[in-house]
Amino acid sequence: MSADPAAATRPRNRKQLIVEAAGRVFSERGYHAASMEQIAAGVGISAAALYRHFPNKYALFAECADLMADRLVTSLDEVPSGAGLADVLGAVTRVTVAHRASGGVYRWEARYLNSEDRRHLRTKFGHVVGRVDEAVQREYPLPDEQLRAAAALGAIGSIAMHHTSIAQRRADELLLASALRVAATDPAATRSGTRTVELPAQPVPRTRRAEILAAAIPLFARDGFASVTNGQIAEAVGLAPSALYRHYPGKVDILAAACLQAAGLLAQGVDRSLHEVSGPHDAVVALAVTYVAYSFEYTALNSVAEAEVAGLPADLRRPVVLAQREHIAVWEEQLRLARPELDPRQARVLVHAGFGVAVEAGRALRWQDSPAHRDAVTALVVGALGL
């Protein structure tokens, strides 16, 4: 009896290949938008064959989240205790850059894990953060070592949040240098309070459409777009669910409006911040001050725009992505004027590193807004950029 040709060619590491492919799909599309068929296609098998390895999409998703954490833990376990900060952050950087395509699973999508799996994942990442924190404090015994450690990891992890094409070795070097600068920055030493930030006020809801949008944003931020129902949104504004359709064709159109509102507010803030700056260095600092202020002031809106844009259909996502690119282009231009040795790709990677610092430092501070917190995060962002 002849052997099954499919079995003969089946790779021994198929399960690993499936998890790798799934990580890319979950990171790119989000947990709810990803399908088993898309994941199976990435491995060249049928969805039915996928179920031989994983009973459902959630089990596969949990395995993906676990894998990234395990890789980081393993890489740090290979670094001797007491090793220098460059060795510790270098290990994290190499793993993160090598697997950047699946890195978004942890940053945004881990909220969809159940409580037990989330607790398990937090324990593993706690080990990673602890090693980095210890090395930061040992090498740079300054205040706020936990904040600096979180921010340094944010610079490294930012590589998973964009698609800038750059050689792995160059990305490793660029992000490691950025993270080391962040770790060496004293958040209390630089005060940006000399610069006044004039952010546009979030529009006051004066129409039913605006009221629906204002009610939906905190729900999306708290529970995730996919978990929020039309009924919840309608209840928040005192409407019947069917009445929402008079103002928006569907729930996804509310999300698109939120993403565009976020882009619009940030663009207005940038325009104001660059008015009357005296040179590229001041321009980059002004951009950093504005982005940090925006992140603290519009935390829910910003988290929705960052975490949920991948779930928009192509026609609704296009204008949002265009607005985001225009914003990044402003940063890139000013950073290259301030640091002429950078090429466009290097500058773009560093801009995203700055955004990553703002996100993780803000999270570490639980987004508790105060002038001191804004100044501290701004100093760390500027450090990440190399100014």
Cite the ranges covered by each PLM segment.
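Amphipathic alpha-helical segments used for helix-helix packing
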Residues: T93-R119, L153, S295-D315, F355-G356, ...
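C-terminal peripheral helix-coil segments that are non-catalytic and often amphipathic
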Residues: M1-S2, G126-P141, H162-A226, W367-L387
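Amphipathic alpha-helical packing segments from all-alpha helical-bundle domains
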Residues: S115-Y140, Q146-L147, L174, D315-R339, ...
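Helix-turn-helix
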Residues: L17, A21, V25-A59, D223-D253, ...
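Generic hydrophobic, amphipathic alpha-helix propensity
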Residues: R14-A22, I39, C64-M68, L72, ...
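Hydrophobic, ordered structural segments
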Residues: M68, L89-S115, V136-R191
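Conserved small-residue-rich
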Residues: E198-L266, F355, V359-G362
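Hydrophobic alpha-helical connector segments
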Residues: D77-S102, R272-T299
